From Swiss-Prot:
Basic residues bias spans: 1035-1045, 1349-1362
Pfam families assigned to the protein according to its UniProt record, in alphabetical order: WD40
Chain intervals with Basic and acidic residues compositional bias: 77-86, 96-116, 128-138, 1255-1277, 1402-1416, 1444-1456
Positions bearing Phosphothreonine: T1021, T1372
SUPFAM superfamilies: WD40 repeat-like
Biased composition (Polar residues): 139-148, 322-338, 412-423, 461-493, 608-620, 888-906, 958-976, 1278-1291, 1299-1312, 1333-1346, 1457-1481, 1502-1513
GO molecular function annotation: RNA binding; zinc ion binding
GO biological process: insulin receptor signaling pathway
Organism per entry: Homo sapiens
Gene: ZNF106
PTM characteristics: Phosphorylated by FYN in vitro.
Designated name of the protein: Zinc finger protein 106
Key word Zinc present: yes
Keywords, comma-separated and alphabetical: Isopeptide bond, Metal-binding, Nucleus, Phosphoprotein, Repeat, Ubl conjugation, WD repeat, Zinc, Zinc-finger
Subunit structure: Interacts with KNOP1. Interacts with TARDBP and NUP107. Interacts (via N-terminus) with RBM39. Interacts with the SH3 domains of FYN and GRB2.
Length: 1883
């Protein structure tokens, strides 16, 4: 895309508002719009015509003489040098160019945008404006003065070589950034310079055309040429599309010349036209820069140099708009519409309809049908005429280049006038330089109205496309001229190649003009060039056609055109269709991308080979199999031609590529692109290299642009803008031009239709027929226009077979996309690209609707392959299928090029479809396909299509499970590398393109280009029709194509019909496969997303399950006989679940293996088809596996939860696609350790019953399902280990709540087991596996659970069934609590999978917290099934509570709560959850949660002791349970509290930190050293088992202590008081009183960064979270706001508002941020959206601590109360008092609430949601968890110690006390009795 150059406009002197001088009219207009209007005015046009006539007369003669003498010699020399230097240049420049094109592209992208609205301005901004300015000064002055660009170019030989040098160098320089254009133009101000340039440039041109821009420059006979080469390189350097730009320059030059020719044709005065055009060109060149000017002097030269400088500039900057403009103008002139018919479709606003482009394109295609070269030239002439007609406008816009060119022509009019041929060729060449400038010329001429004002905005892409096609044509023509003039044999390929693009442009612009121009060219070439016999023959043919078409064109031009045309004809004879299509594609490419333009130039230079490639590619398109044969033929024929050595190499490569390419269609595209690229490589490897680089970077950016405008003809220019590989561009150009042509000629419209049909996804048969029809039509058009029997015969002969198969092979190549009948077809066309698209893209949107259509499209496009492909699952990846079919043919071809081609092809399609349907399914599919292709390409560099197909399938399969995120990531990374995609689709397409480039990087540059070009072709096709047009529209276009089909031979129609039938069959299969694959991929994608949600939901569900479990435990505790009563209590719920579970388990027993699939299908659908479906599948499979192995592991019941973990592991294994494998392994190991004694079967049973239990529990649990599924998804997403942990947690959580949670069924089953294990200890009966299935409506669940935990339960029963259950629950809950510490990034003891005991619980909890924080369940899950679930639960707890909070609306949570008796569940759960919450500070103390649950349960009963024993076992290092009571020692306010390693760490305002034993509550250590109050502390694991204590103080320091030695290891000095500390990701975050957050590396305590967050207000609290891959830092502040920032750089993402006072505390759970504030409320915000979700009220003072435990939230308040809220219902469940002062800090560990008060007191209170003591005092509704707290409340809050009279307000009590009676004691006793006797609430 010309943007590269424009990025750095040569100087600020060319803003759009700069005054532009029309040299023709002598008028100066201010602003591009005014200038464009002037240019488009009739007066200016008349003047231009007159001047052109003069210039034609002079310039052609001069040019002819020039070409005949010096130019021919220089061309020959340059050709030799070019061929010699091409490889080195290609390599060198490819390297540099690849880089430059990318940044250039990027730079130009903005400029392109500018171009879009002011491309003329752009052009003018560059040299064009200068040209305009300098037009008045005269051509020489213009060159000298007009180019600030010139001045840029002025630096060094490129700038100053003199016109020959400057032109050569200036040209490249001009493009370069116009940096040298001034100098170059200045030095080359004279005609002599022009002549010099002419020679130097011609030779340059030759080598450029042949070898590439750089080689051309390097091969310049002039020293300047090397400078020019350097400038070309610089140009390349300067532009991302540099590589393309040289080609583009060439193409531009050719186009300009062609445009000049067209203009002459338009004028019907070849010489006059040339002169007028040259004048315009000079003016425009003057305006544009010396490039155009020096181009003027010698066409080949001009085109070469102009392309490098002016052309390239225009290519990137002006070229976009100008080429578009030219195309538009040419088209407008020809059809009265803008040449942007195709472009119009993408850019409807284009001032000029795209009919012209359509006409041109159709003409081109028709001409192409007859003879690619002949047609191309006439077409280009038509474009030129069109441009000439439009050029009056465009020329004004382009006037600077045109004027400059004219000036140069005038300046170099000596040369120009020296001979008509020289003049003509110079005109042509100059027009080629003007190709960008001709467009510019057109722009100046019509710029005011057409290009400058109107097109600039919309024309950025449309114009770029249009102009680019023209530019390509011009470039091509220029290339033709210079090669033709310089050396006939050498130039033949160049001429043909140049001509090919030129023809393509003409095709897009106007076949007739092209023909006329071609005649002129032929004449010029004949007179100016020594044509080889073949060339002469071609010339004759061309002359015949040209004379027929455009006898007006000057003889010299005619000769030149003829020579070029002859070459084209020669190779066209071999593969005229291919050449045409390739040229067309080339046209597109060079138009679309500077790099492509350069490629085109390169390819033009190597037109023989390139044309052959085109022919072969086109032929291949027509009939894929025959295409290969014919391509080989064409290649061989081309190889026979003068430039054939390179062509042969490339052809053989292409043939090999064909063999390797997935299918003939792909082969065609690939081969075409490969041939072009190879020709470029050999002839101008520099250019091809540039093309590669530019393609990579520019291609993507341009891709987007192209996508936008690709559907219409203007797409061609856009394609070149896009910087697609030359072959891709050709294909795209063909497609686009076909689209554009639709309006002009029936066959041409058919071409457009065919292209669009590919995109449209019309019937492949129709497409094939259309394409075949198009080809015959094209042949007819070509024949009619170029009356060259040779061409016709050649085309017919070469493509006859292919026509029989699918006559218009090039067309079919184009059709490859159109072949796709549906969007699916388009995808199929892209096959692999589609797969990549599917992988990374929007599977949800794409999967179903797009998949069938896409698949069909694919099949259609790859008709020959489709038959083989139909069976393939991913038939829509027809590329792969085609590869299979064509594999025999393609076996010879290197798979590298095939891969490159495939990936590029996919990229092309992707690009096409991406733009119109960025979010469309097809884009998604294509993106995935492209990604897959990339992978395939990279992986299968030498493999065949079938492996690629399999890879694609595998990728799809993988994508189904993992790909949504993975593919997206890969695509994103690809897209990021390309930096091209603006939208997701664009990104995908671009990424695929980048991948294509990357993949093809292993292949030769040419191959890469070809591959990309292939993609482009497809994509162009797909884009043209599918993205922009609905399938119906595409079908209509296809109908248009049908018209061409009708014209096409009967065999083509028959072949198409057969192919269509094959494709339709394969399409059906593919559609089914696509649907399946997309469904799988979509499911996987959704699953990944949902898994994240599931993770949260599972957390919530786990909390809910805990609540259920708590309810069960409550029942157990209430009856104290946990066995039967608890079973019955929770059994009501659980029995139904059990029934379903038993049924499920029976089913599982019956169908252990099948059940997994069953689960996959029905359970997935039942629970959560997408996210949990996969997870469920995994879980289910383990369940069955476990089921099979259940009998073995039933020995260890202790680890009920562990069996869940193994199941989870199995689930994980089933989920491995979701990256659960690692986790599952860990879980399995840990589970095996833990579950060696634990029967897995019960777990399985639980699971099996789970689906049904889910159903039974479905209503309440469905929401749970979602949460569980989401959590599951999250866990999976987080990491394999996290997934396993998540699964286990899901299992636990899902046990009860996730009955509707099939995704986490394994988890649910284990959770059910856990919960039921706790609730079904009484259910000893259901022990036998047989019993389970049968017994259990109720028992099944219980038995499944109990079996898993039977022995465990029995053991616990022995200890005390209740206790056993409690510990289990508490363990699970502890795990849940552990989840809470997730914030902490310590996975310290999580990996202690072996420990199932309480110690393990603690450690695992801590580790799990850390794990969950890290999202790495690690071996914590393996520690115990319980632990894994628990940590997950903890995550769930935190997440659950959070998710509950964040998802207050989530019914699953609410339902779970409601269904599970919210209060009891909450109470029991609260115990567990609170433990998790406590573990917020430390993971380990969260491990105590199970204890707390047990304690909660045991509080009522004496189970406490048994629970303690079990807990003792589960707590490492702590044999005893933490005890309630107070901790003495602090003398001032306790500011922070944390539990770590079963130790309580507290910091105080007394400047000390104390460590207490949780059991003895004794102070075991004091940390001193701070000189001021210690505000915060943090104990964290550092390395290994080492832990460090960080304390933040008001003395502006953070002290780091060794926990064991209690020595201060390091003191970190800070800028202000340290108010809060937080650690995660091995980073310590410190919030300061000045509003900043300072980060330290925990490993070495080195300061990392300082984030300015809330200054000057202090930071009060910190938290962390994750948003996808982004790490979030949440900062609470005294300014009443919470800021969510990027944890890496502190970038503010969003602000959470709502609090009216200082934020004092925060807790992040899942996606919710719970914040407590001094405004006496707790707010829950969605961290991702910033939305305030909930508000919890009821506090009477500032909320100092917020802790989330599963489904409950525990808050500490300055009103001395700890409150327990239900997250979902906002209900206050409990209140804990007993404090004498304000609560400053709180943590929860093992169901113990540890609070620090302002008076320095610390106390531990057991959190027991099962015990509720209601204050029935009148007007009081507090429910206390401890009787003593109620008593204190009654005595302190409801009674006045100094009461005189006291009336007992207890409900139903009327006792009255008076102080007189001394009844105060009685009153107190009375009230206490109320509290003891009447307050108990049955929970």
């Amino acid at each position: 895309m010309p943007v590269g150059r424009i990025e750095c406009p040569s100087s600020p002197s060319f803003p759009r508002d700069i005054s532009h001088e029309c040299r023709v009219c002598g008028v100066t207009e201010v602003g591009l719009s005014a200038y464009a209007k002037h240019i488009s005015g009739q007066l200016h046009k008349d003047n231009v015509d007159a001047q052109e006539r003069e210039d034609d007369g002079k310039g052609e003669e001069e040019e002819e003489d020039y070409f005949d003498k010096e130019l021919i010699q220089l061309i020959k020399q340059r050709k030799e040098q070019s061929r010699q230097d091409e490889p080195s240049n290609s390599n060198q420049e490819i390297n540099s160019d690849d880089r430059r094109p990318q940044w250039r592209r990027e730079d130009r992208i903005p400029y392109q945008d500018r171009e879009s609205y002011s491309q003329p301005a752009w052009h003018h901004r560059g040299p064009p404006q200068r040209d305009w300015k300098w037009e008045k000064d005269g051509f020489n002055n213009t060159r000298k003065n007009s180019f600030p660009h010139s001045l840029r170019n002025g630096g060094g030989p490129r700038g100053r070589s003199g016109w020959h040098k400057g032109v050569a160098g200036g040209s490249s320089t001009w493009f370069h950034n116009h940096s040298n254009s001034g100098g170059g133009w200045l030095s080359n101000s004279g005609a002599v310079d022009w002549n010099h340039n002419g020679t130097g440039r011609n030779s340059s041109w030759l080598s450029e055309g042949t070898g590439g821009f750089s080689s051309w420059h390097m091969n310049n006979s002039n020293g300047n040429w090397k400078s020019s080469v350097r400038s070309t390189n610089n140009w390349n350097y300067s532009g991302p599309g540099d590589k393309f730009q040289p080609g583009r320059n060439r193409n531009s030059n050719c186009q300009m010349e062609d445009m000049t020719m067209l203009w002459n044709k338009k004028s019907n005065k070849s010489n006059k036209y040339s002169h007028d055009r040259y004048n315009w060109q000079r003016q425009e060149n003057d305006k544009l820069g010396t490039v155009a000017t020096y181009r003027g002097p010698s066409e080949g030269f001009t085109s070469d140099k102009f392309p490098s400088e002016g052309l390239l500039d225009f290519n990137f900057e002006q070229l976009e708009s100008q080429t578009t403009k030219q195309a538009d103008t040419a088209t407008s002139k020809v059809s009265g519409k803008n040449g942007s018919a195709a472009r119009e479709k993408p850019r409807r606003w284009t001032p000029y309809p795209s009919q012209k482009t359509l006409d041109l394109q159709s003409g081109l295609k028709d001409i192409t049908g007859n003879k690619s070269e002949m047609i191309e030239k006439p077409l280009f002439d038509f474009s030129l005429i069109t441009t000439g007609i439009q050029e009056p406008q465009t020329d004004e816009t382009r006037n600077s280049p045109t004027q400059k060119t004219q000036k140069e022509i005038h300046t170099g009019s000596l040369n120009h006038k020296a001979s008509s041929d020289s003049a003509a060729s110079f005109e042509v060449v100059r027009q080629c330089p003007t190709a960008e400038k001709p467009e510019q010329e057109h722009t100046p001429n019509k710029m005011p109205s057409l290009k400058s004002p109107l097109l600039p905005c919309p024309a950025t892409k449309s114009l770029s496309q249009k102009q680019d096609p023209k530019n390509i044509s011009k470039n091509t023509k220029t290339n033709f001229f210079s090669p033709g003039e310089h050396s006939n044999p050498s130039n033949k390929p160049t001429v043909e190649d140049n001509h090919g693009p030129y023809i393509s442009k003409l095709r897009s612009s106007c076949p007739h003009v092209l023909k006329g121009n071609k005649s002129t060219f032929g004449s010029q070439k004949q007179s100016g060039d020594n044509l080889n016999d073949t060339l002469r023959k071609a010339k004759e043919v061309l002359q015949c056609h040209e004379s027929l078409q455009n006898p007006l064109l000057s003889t010299s031009k005619s000769t030149r055109n003829y020579a070029k045309a002859s070459r084209n004809v020669e190779e066209s004879e071999k593969g005229s269709l291919k050449i045409e299509f390739q040229v067309h594609a080339l046209e597109d490419e060079s138009d679309g991308e500077t790099s492509d333009t350069e490629k085109h130039g390169t390819k033009i230079g190597t037109l023989g080979s390139a044309t052959t490639e085109l022919l072969s590619g086109s032929t291949r398109t027509a009939d894929e199999k025959e295409e290969d044969d014919r391509i080989l033929k064409t290649s061989r024929e081309l190889s026979t031609s003068p430039c054939n050595p390179i062509v042969r190499q490339k052809e053989s490569e292409l043939q090999m590529t064909s063999a390797a390419s997935p299918h003939p269609g792909l082969l065609l595209d690939l081969k075409t692109s490969l041939e072009d690229a190879q020709v470029d490589d050999s002839i101008k490897s520099h250019v091809s290299y540039e093309t590669e680089g530019f393609e990579s970077a520019s291609l993507d950016a341009e891709l987007q642009k192209s996508d936008i405008s690709q559907p219409s003809g203007p797409l061609l220019p856009e394609l070149s803008k896009l910087g697609f590989p030359a072959s891709l561009q050709r294909d795209l150009t063909r497609h686009i031009s076909l689209k554009s042509k639709t309006g002009v000629h029936l066959p041409e419209p058919n071409l457009n239709s065919a292209r669009r049909i590919r995109n449209i996804s019309g019937h492949r048969k129709s497409e094939t027929e259309k394409e075949s029809g198009l080809k015959p039509t094209l042949r007819q058009i070509l024949n009619a226009s170029r009356r060259n029997v040779n061409w016709e015969q050649v085309i017919q002969q070469v493509t006859k077979k292919k026509q029989e198969l699918g006559k218009g092979l090039p067309r079919f190549g184009i059709e490859m996309v159109p072949l796709v009948q549906n969007e699916q077809e388009a995808l199929d066309l892209d096959g692999e690209p589609d797969l990549s698209s599917l992988e990374g893209f929007q599977w949800e949107g794409v999967s179903i609707s797009s998949s069938p259509g896409l698949a069909r499209k694919r099949s259609l496009s790859e008709s020959s392959v489709i038959m083989d492909r139909a069976p393939s699952v991913y038939s829509f990846f027809s590329e792969e299928g085609t590869g299979k079919e064509n594999e025999p043919q393609q076996m010879v071809s290197p798979s590298n090029s095939l891969r490159a081609g495939q990936s590029q092809k996919a990229t092309m399609h992707l690009k096409q479809e991406v733009t119109p349907r960025a979010a469309s399914l097809r884009t998604g599919e294509r993106a995935e396909n492209v990604a897959t292709q990339r992978r395939h390409s990279a992986q299968l560099s030498s493999d065949h299509i079938i492996p690629l197909m399999h890879l694609a399938k595998d990728l799809n399969s993988q994508e189904r499970s993992i790909p949504p995120s993975e593919n997206q990531n890969s695509q994103e990374s690809n897209g990021e590398g390309n930096c091209l995609s603006s939208s997701a689709s664009s990104a995908l397409a671009i990424s695929s393109l980048a991948d294509a480039a990357t993949d093809s990087s292993c292949t030769s540059g040419a191959e890469q280009n070809d591959g990309q070009s292939i993609r482009k072709k497809r994509r162009a096709t797909g884009d043209g029709s599918s993205p922009e047009l609905p399938s119906l529209e595409r079908k209509n276009k296809r109908r248009k194509i049908k018209g061409k089909k009708e014209r096409s031979q009967v065999d083509q129609l028959l072949n198409i019909s057969l192919r269509e039938e094959e494709l339709s069959k394969s399409l059906q299969c593919m559609d089914n496969n696509l649907l399946q694959a997309r469904a799988a991929l979509q499911t996987a994608y959704v699953e990944v997303q949902r898994l994240l949600m599931l993770k949260q939901q599972i957390t919530m569900e786990m909390s809910a399950l805990r609540t259920h479990r708590i309810q069960i435990l409550q029942g157990l505790q209430e009856t104290y006989e946990p066995s039967e009563h608890p079973d019955q209590v929770p059994c009501s719920l659980t029995r139904e679940r059990r029934n379903s579970r038993s049924q499920t388990s029976i089913d599982a027993a019956l169908l252990p293996t099948p059940f997994f699939p069953l689960f996959l299908e029905p359970p997935s659908s039942h629970v959560s088809p997408s996210p949990t479906g996969a997870s469920l599948q995994i879980t289910t499979s383990p369940t069955f596996q476990t089921h099979g192995s259940v009998p073995a592991p039933d020995s260890s019941v202790q680890i009920k939860q562990e069996p869940m973990s193994p199941e989870q592991d199995e689930n994980v294994n089933a989920v491995p696609p979701s990256s659960a494998c690692n986790v599952s392994k860990e879980l399995l190991e840990a589970n095996r350790e833990i579950s060696d004694s634990c029967p897995v079967y019960p777990v399985i049973t639980a699971r099996l019953s789970l689906p049904e239990s889910t159903e039974s529990f479905h209503e309440p649990s469905q929401e749970l399902k979602f949460s569980v599924e989401q959590r599951n998804t999250r866990n999976r997403e987080n990491s394999p280990s996290s997934q396993s942990a998540g699964l286990s947690s899901i299992n636990k959580e899902g046990e009860e709540p996730t009955k509707g949670n099939s995704g986490s069924e394994a988890c649910t089953s284990s959770f059910l087991r856990l919960s039921f294990a706790s609730e079904t200890p009484l259910e000893k009966e259901p022990h036998s596996p047989a019993d389970q299935p049968e017994q259990q409506a109720e028992s099944t669940l219980t038995s499944a659970e109990t079996r898993g935990s039977k022995k465990k339960k029995k053991l616990r029963k022995k200890k005390s069934l209740r206790a056993a259950h409690v510990p289990e629950n508490s363990d699970t809950e502890q795990d849940v609590l552990t989840v809470k510490p997730v914030r902490k990034v310590k996975a310290g003891k999580l990996i202690k999978g072996g420990k199932v005991t309480t110690s393990t619980w603690e450690d695992s909890r801590t580790g799990r917290e850390q794990e969950s924080v890290r999202d790495e369940p690690d071996s914590d899950s393996s520690l115990e099934v319980l632990e894994i679930p628990n940590p997950q639960l903890e995550v769930v707890a935190i997440d659950s509570s959070e998710s509950g909070e964040e998802k207050p609306d989530s019914p699953s949570k609410k339902d779970i709560w409601n269904s599970t008796e919210q209060n009891p569940l909450e109470t029991s759960r609260s115990g567990c959850d609170e433990v998790s919450s406590t573990s917020e500070i430390g993971t380990r103390y969260k491990d105590g949660i199970p204890v707390s649950v047990a304690e909660t349960q045991t509080v009522i009963s004496s189970i406490k002791g048994s629970k303690n024993s079990s807990e003792i076992s589960s707590e490492p290092g702590d044999d005893d349970e933490p005890t309630e009571g107070s901790f003495e020692g602090h003398q001032a306010a306790v500011n922070a509290i944390q539990i770590f390693g079963n130790l309580l760490y507290t910091c105080s305002a007394d400047k000390t930190v104390r460590v207490y034993n949780l059991v003895s509550r004794k102070c075991i250590g004091v940390f001193e050293g701070h000189t001021s109050k210690v505000n915060c502390l943090l104990v964290t694991q550092t390395s290994g088992k080492n832990a460090a204590l960080y304390t933040g103080s008001s003395d502006h320091t953070i002290r780091c202590y060794n926990v064991k030695s209690r020595e201060c290891v390091e003191q970190l000095q800070l800028e202000d008081r340290v108010l809060c500390l937080h650690s995660r990701w091995r980073i310590l975050y410190a919030g300061l009183a000045n509003g900043t957050v300072v980060t330290f590396n925990i490993k070495n305590n080195k300061r990392l960064e300082i984030f300015e967050c809330h200054g000057p207000r202090a930071v009060s609290c910190l938290a962390t979270a994750q948003e996808g891959a982004r790490k979030l830092l949440v900062v609470g502040s005294y300014d009443c706001t919470i800021s969510v920032r990027d944890a890496r750089n502190g970038l503010l993402l969003r602000t959470l508002e709502g609090h009216s006072k200082t934020i004092l505390c925060m807790k992040v759970v899942n996606d919710l941020v719970f914040s407590g504030s001094s405004d006496q409320s707790v707010h829950a915000h969605n961290i991702h959206t910033g939305e305030l979700v909930r508000i919890y009220k009821g506090h009477n003072h500032a909320v100092t601590v917020v802790n989330i435990l599963g489904k409950v939230m525990v808050t500490a308040c300055l009103d001395k109360f700890v409150r327990v809220y239900e997250l979902q219902s906002h209900d206050r469940l409990q209140v804990y008092g007993g404090h004498k002062d304000m609560i400053m800090c709180m943590t929860i560990h093992k169901s113990m609430i540890y609070t620090g008060c302002y008076d320095g007191s610390i106390q531990a209170v057991r959190l027991n949601l099962m015990q509720n003591y209601r204050c029935w005092w009148h007007g009081c509704s507090l429910i206390f968890g401890v009787v003593d707290h109620l008593k204190q409340h009654l005595l302190t809050d409801h009674t006045n110690p100094n009461f005189q009279t006291l009336k007992c307000r207890w409900k139903n009590c009327d006792a009255f006390f008076t102080a007189r009676k001394g009844s105060k004691q009685d009153a107190a006793g009375h009230i206490e009795r109320h509290a003891e006797d009447d307050s108990k609430i049955d929970s």
